[in-house]
Amino acid sequence: MNFCSKKKILKQCFFEFLGTGLIIFLGISSLVVSKLTNFHFNHCEISCIWGLGVFISICFCSSVSGAHLNPAITIFLFLSSQFNKKKVIPYILSQISGTFFFTFLIYLIFNNLLNSFESKYNIVRGTKKSLELASLFCVFPKENYNFIHDFILEILIGIIFIIILMKLSEKNNLFKFYKFINPFLIGTLVIIINLFLTSYSNITLNPARDLGPRIFLSLIGWGKLAFTGDDNIIFPYFLIPTIAPIIGINLGGWIYILYIKK
């Protein structure tokens, strides 16, 4: 690999780092502000902020890196021979590093508010009570959750998501003539999924969106609870937002290629 190729890959990875991180920065910040200040966003507004983050990030990254912004999509594109294998690991590391770093930035910005909330409600990091605060950064089990149910649901939504995304990205799609329309529609799809499903189940669709913040939480006091979410050591909760989207998006992608693509 020559110098120019390395420089190009480095630039692409940097854009994946920034793009994925920006989604996290906007989305998690809205949750933190709504929870810890007097400025409250409702569920619809928070969903719109997440969708807007996706829209902005795709517009920002697409011309340079292709705007994967998601390890599951990177893996699918590689397995379907649409992406250079030399870029797979750098892209995935960039995406997860981006969410980790921007979670760190959020923590620095809102550290005083987080500490005040912990003091006010006698919250000790690493205890189950502390999951109320940790859930601002990544997803944790809802009351009476079922591991198998949530895992399968994440897969199913991933299948639907990638099929719609691939259909929107077809070369002969009418929207391809208007560069901002496709990112807007994908952002709108994210808004719809958030609106109708996140209050019922923790749908992430993106391993990096959850794993980066989860790793960060494990380093600042939540420890292994950041990964397990409860007492289930055999099936730790982080497997749902980390592994299920990869399975779902790859299944959906191949369904599209084999049965839908013209």
Swiss-Prot record:
State if Zinc-finger is listed as a keyword: no
Which intervals of this chain are the motif NPA 1? 70-72
Per the record, ranges on the Extracellular side are: 37-41, 111-145, 198-201, 220-234
Which Pfam family, just one, is annotated for this protein? MIP
Membrane topology term: Multi-pass membrane protein
Point out the residue ranges buried in the membrane yet not crossing it: 66-69, 70-80, 202-205, 206-219
Any one Gene Ontology molecular-function term assigned to this protein's record: glycerol channel activity
Q: Which reaction does it catalyse?
A: glycerol(in) = glycerol(out)
First-listed, main subcellular location of the protein, grouped into a coarse class = membrane
Which keywords are on file for this protein? Answer: Cell membrane, Membrane, Transmembrane, Transmembrane helix, Transport
Membrane spanning stretches: 8-36, 42-62, 87-110, 146-171, 181-197, 235-259
The domain of life is Bacteria
List the GO terms this entry assigns under cellular component, sorted alphabetically: plasma membrane
Relate the protein's function as given in its record.
Answer: Mediates glycerol diffusion across the cytoplasmic membrane via a pore-type mechanism.
Say which family it is in: Belongs to the MIP/aquaporin (TC 1.A.8) family.
- What does the entry's free-text domain comment contain? Aquaporins contain two tandem repeats each containing three membrane-spanning domains and a pore-forming loop with the signature motif Asn-Pro-Ala (NPA).
Name listed for the protein in its UniProt record: Glycerol uptake facilitator protein
Species the sequence originates in? Buchnera aphidicola subsp. Schizaphis graminum (strain Sg)
